[in-house]
Amino acid sequence: MNEPTRLPRIPRRTALLATGAILLMVAACGQAAVTAPTPAPTRAATQAGATLPGAAAGGPAQPGQASAAGPAATAGSSAGGTFPGGFLVADRGNGRLLAIDRTGRIWWRFPTAGAVPASQAFAADDAFLAPDGRTIVANDEAHEVIDRIDIATGRITWQYGHYGRAGSGAGFLHTPDDAYPLANGDIVVADIENCRVIEINPAKQIVRQWGRTGACTAAAPATFGRPNGDTPLPDGGILITEITGSRVVRLAADGHVVFDIHVPVRYPSDAQLDSAGNVIVADYSNPGSVVRVSPTGKLLWRYGPKTGAGRLDHPSLATPLADGTILINDDFRHRLVIVDPATNTIVWQYGTTDRPGQTANHLNVPDGHEPLPAGISF
């Protein structure tokens, strides 16, 4: 995704657990509760306006919605079985990655001392486990870099981009988003302000590009309008989300357009496909929403309460789970929630609503998530 800023920065995924596929995550950026203008600010920019830990106070839960009060309301609900391996979360405002099980227990975290290059800060907005299970790729749009983290050593071992410097030349990125590790060792990323999606190999060479650098018109497949989502698909294709024009484009492995549709949201973020091939996409706004749209552009479902505990504030990623529920990053309410489309209610939550923090059951602008497979261990 991409937003206004809260950290120094700029401007969100179905878990593809199939063999050879990438474990997708979402993540988008988040910042202050600002309605995206035209052109919309990046998510990183939005995040920059987010509240620091402990600075905000929350209101009471409303009838029919999950309580925001504490771990009991977020950790052991019946919805926990929808991600038996727990999930990876990019807790952007706290500058950390967490692996959390379905009971809310944190069983892995990054960074630890010495993990990040000297003089650099870490503020990942997305993170995805590589198919081989040995590394995690983290996207840090605030600092214009992509990091590969070695799980065994807990250190960054590879970085692409020039830290703190945006650009379009060789080795540069401009507001990168959703960096996904591929089975061949490459990484695919949406380079938002360069209006392109690129595939980068381990030698830091661009080996494939969708769109033309600097050409920011929504006219797929030739050009793309500020793409902020680039979800790899099991068939070798890619699902691209465009901020400009609120469009979602599905490309086949050979690059031809399968569909190119307008989605009924103000600021689309990190579109995913559900098991039926429909598009699930978050509206990075306040109040925000999540919609399901058919490949022909027909609205099938919307979740978007305008008030109360169910209201979303800049949701950046919505991932359809195996049981039909939807896992959502609710960035500026500092929580992850699961919504049941059958009842349009929150049935599970991690994070304390409107209360950012670092302690148990607290997050601070969580901007990315990835459901993990059962039995995973770092």
Regions found by a protein language model. Give the residues of each.
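Generic cytosolic/nucleocytoplasmic N-terminal low-complexity/intrinsically disordered segments
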Residues: 1-2, 343
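Post-signal peptide N-terminal segment of mature Sec-exported envelope proteins
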Residues: 36-76
